[in-house]
């Protein structure tokens, strides 16, 4: 029996695949399945059965679809393809991983560049990769390994040392964890200079003359002049060293030393509140530096361990909106946050507003439909009231957008069509089983127009009274909302409103609920009908 046949008939394999199909969001089950397949297929080489290789590839790919932030698995997958001789496929896997991180994964870049060092012989093509990596991860606090690789390739592939000097000089200005190593390289390079002309490789002639008073065309005794020039260079280097050292110590002591998780964590893993707080402070600090590339990078770093927490997604999108006016970028961040975060309420709310500002009503509709379908088309049963109310508001907005017909059902009964109104009624019928019922009633009073007061009164307030739902009838806010519905009806005169509330609404209140209802009604009366305070008091204090 071949390995593939033996594997698919293996009882353990069946159990592992069943666990993955039942719990696709469990990283532990995916890892167990992948490890089992790889172990059963060992040694994996070009002669391994094609069916086994296909199974391994499918498992890797499916796992990375579910968990796109697994840096190490992109690397393992890519290097496996390299081992099998599929260089182009390795490139694609690395690039797929980098795309998942918006090109901002230091681990993926260093692994990819090591791979590129071995397979790309064309110098320009290779250095283009390094330049792209520099753009995205060059400012990373722990990017020392990347810069080491870059300098190493420049040394081995470039005949001129000017590029080396340029890159090294750039590194000196970055607060890196391993900054002292690069300063040592710089000072060693200065010591190795044997001719004044070589100083032009450090910087331009004009800058040397203007800032350091060093003339590389000096015609006097060049030996002593060169030594003096080196002293000036070392002096300014040490001054720069002190500045960068202070920055590094500050960043490390306040932030980096308190961050222990620098990798993706599954939804089951809890990150300590102290570490989360450190990340938030670190991001605030980064934003104040006003270096966009570093801000993007540190947000991406924070999302690695905190992908399932909504606060980083929200903070990132708000920075894009408020500081960069980048609504499109904020939308993409929030859509990713919706996929990862366990708490979605605030993300959805912010995403709704961003989509509306972008006038992407089709996307808004699709999002609302997905949210509704995720609750089996019973969004009114969601425990979180904010999700329900936001859904209601934006569904209404979407129906009344330019894409809706002016004769559509959304206009027939005011602002909510029959479908949405039914959802409101179902939510209210849950009474104390659902949160936010008072807020819902209060919002409905404000939500409807003057033309629909009668409809709301008949189908909400009178219906609840008719059904005798004590949860509402003993709640002063219910009666307060009912009174305000009538009071804010602009089609009635002040006298009509007053008489209707005093003669029609108040008498419907059971006096056994007087103690719980009276405070809220008193508040209403003091605000709108102070002259009826005595009437209210008499109505609820007289003996039955």
Swiss-Prot record:
A motif (Nuclear localization signal) lies at residues 230-235. It comes from the Eukaryota. It is found in: Nucleus. GO terms for molecular function: RNA binding. GO terms for biological process: mRNA 5'-splice site recognition; mRNA splicing, via spliceosome. HAT repeats lie at residues 7-39, 51-83, 85-118, 121-156, 163-195, 255-288, 290-322, 366-397, 456-488. The keyword Nucleus applies. GO terms for cellular component: commitment complex; nucleus; spliceosomal complex; U1 snRNP; U2-type prespliceosome. Keywords: mRNA processing, mRNA splicing, Nucleus, Repeat, Ribonucleoprotein, RNA-binding, Spliceosome. Component of the 18S U1 snRNP particle, a subcomplex of the spliceosome. Essential component of the U1 snRNP particle, which recognizes and binds the 5'-splice site of pre-mRNA. Together with other non-snRNP factors, U1 snRNP forms the spliceosomal commitment complex, that targets pre-mRNA to the splicing pathway. U1 snRNP is cotranscriptionally recruited to intron-containing genes. Required for U1 snRNP biogenesis. Present with 1730 molecules/cell in log phase SD medium. This is U1 small nuclear ribonucleoprotein component PRP42.
